[in-house]
Amino acid sequence: MSEAKSGPEYASFFAVMGASAAMVFSALGAAYGTAKSGTGIAAMSVMRPEMIMKSIIPVVMAGIIAIYGLVVAVLIANSLNDGISLYRSFLQLGAGLSVGLSGLAAGFAIGIVGDAGVRGTAQQPRLFVGMILILIFAEVLGLYGLIVALILSTK
């Protein structure tokens, strides 16, 4: 009888896995994006040290991806209670996977574009605007996952 109202005992496991997936996958994407872009900045700064601050944009954008995962992980963690239903728990898992995996993909895209863009901008400064536009499109991938995760986690 109590399972119909509150769900099985193991239901909270899936919600916790959603919070973990949100944080872990988005942090992996952000770390990769930061490392890959940072490598490009380090290589570029040997020849053009005056461009370091201008080239830091990909690193900042990669860091924002981790914030998306943190927001969803906190929302999921705050909604946990003893009697969570299995339906709600699977919604939380879906929300975590949504923001986490889209953050992972966005982080990879930001890292690759940031590395190549920073190195290219050092040789041809007119490439900067193109790099920023591509970075924005890569960042939006993570934002799409955040929007879906917010919809799922607040259902």
From Swiss-Prot:
One GO cellular component term: synaptic vesicle membrane
Post-translational modification: Ubiquitinated by RNF182, leading to its degradation via the ubiquitin-proteasome pathway.
Lumenal-facing ranges: 1-10, 77-92, 153-155
Gene3D superfamilies linked: lithium bound rotor ring of v- atpase
A molecular function GO annotation: proton-transporting ATPase activity, rotational mechanism
Spans traversing the lipid bilayer: 11-33, 56-76, 93-114, 132-152
Domain of life: Eukaryota
Role of this protein: Proton-conducting pore forming subunit of the V0 complex of vacuolar(H+)-ATPase (V-ATPase), a multisubunit enzyme composed of a peripheral complex (V1) that hydrolyzes ATP and a membrane integral complex (V0) that translocates protons. V-ATPase is responsible for acidifying and maintaining the pH of intracellular compartments and in some cell types, is targeted to the plasma membrane, where it is responsible for acidifying the extracellular environment.
Name of the featured protein: V-type proton ATPase 16 kDa proteolipid subunit c
